[in-house]
Amino acid sequence: MVKIQVTPDLSIGDGQPFALIGGPCVIESEDFCLKMADQIRQICDRLQISYIFKSSFDKANRTSIDSFRGQSLEDGLQTLQRVKEKIGVPVLTDIHESYQAAIVAEVVDVLQIPAFLCRQTDLLLAAAATGRVINVKKGQFLAPWDMQNVVKKLEQGGAQNILLTERGSSFGYNTLVVDFRSLPQMRALGYPVVFDATHSVQMPGGKGNSSGGQREFVPYLARAAVAVGIDALFMEIHENPEQALSDGPNMVYLSQLEAYLQQLLAIRTALAW
């Protein structure tokens, strides 16, 4: 498995420290992102965990037309740039259309391909052409071994730094389940694997005009993933998920984050990952 260089000071993969990709689901405001990024960074610093801040400038796949989507592309990138400069952490955000790739890559360290879009060839090639690290969420509809075709598209587009993320599979209506076999199966493709612990407990469209979630199961799934073996954990975090503007039901409380991460590090240490 290759080692992915996110910044000169942060690598993910073979022999590298455990990494957290985390932050609020959507950019609610610049001040809020700065506060969240700073507090999460402090936790990660105490635990010696590598940290990448995550938030979306646009939630283009919300259940309802009336749901909050985020800031504009320009304002969102300005917020992410401020997080990089003031908090001193690399940043990740997702793109939904090919034209966004080059623009967003001017600011972020990691481009994320949403699960619903993981087979979109033009989007993958546009992301690959930027030279940035690319984190691809495995589609809820996709077998883990079928991610080899996603990887081939990215490689043929010139991408060398790829992360593959498990975020659950559709199980009937409004429900996801996690098949942890997917983690070693995707790692066998030669790239680091990430587990998305919060979207894996999402209940897509489960509240009628928005998605539900079962955040109480996040720590259980995260512990299982670390025991199986992952290189990074993806987790959406909010100081008050009940008031969050997107994905509140599956985001974890900031106040609980450090305890969760301590448990995960203990498992990694016990298994000598």
From Swiss-Prot:
It comes from the Bacteria. GO terms for biological process: keto-3-deoxy-D-manno-octulosonic acid biosynthetic process. The keyword Transferase applies. Keywords: Cytoplasm, Lipopolysaccharide biosynthesis, Transferase. This is 2-dehydro-3-deoxyphosphooctonate aldolase. One of its GO terms (cellular component) is cytoplasm. Pathway: Carbohydrate biosynthesis; 3-deoxy-D-manno-octulosonate biosynthesis; 3-deoxy-D-manno-octulosonate from D-ribulose 5-phosphate: step 2/3; Bacterial outer membrane biogenesis; lipopolysaccharide biosynthesis. It catalyses: D-arabinose 5-phosphate + phosphoenolpyruvate + H2O = 3-deoxy-alpha-D-manno-2-octulosonate-8-phosphate + phosphate. The gene is kdsA. SUPFAM superfamilies: Aldolase. Belongs to the KdsA family. Pfam families: DAHP_synth_1. Its main location: cytoplasm. Its EC number is 2.5.1.55. GO terms for molecular function: 3-deoxy-8-phosphooctulonate synthase activity. It is found in: Cytoplasm.
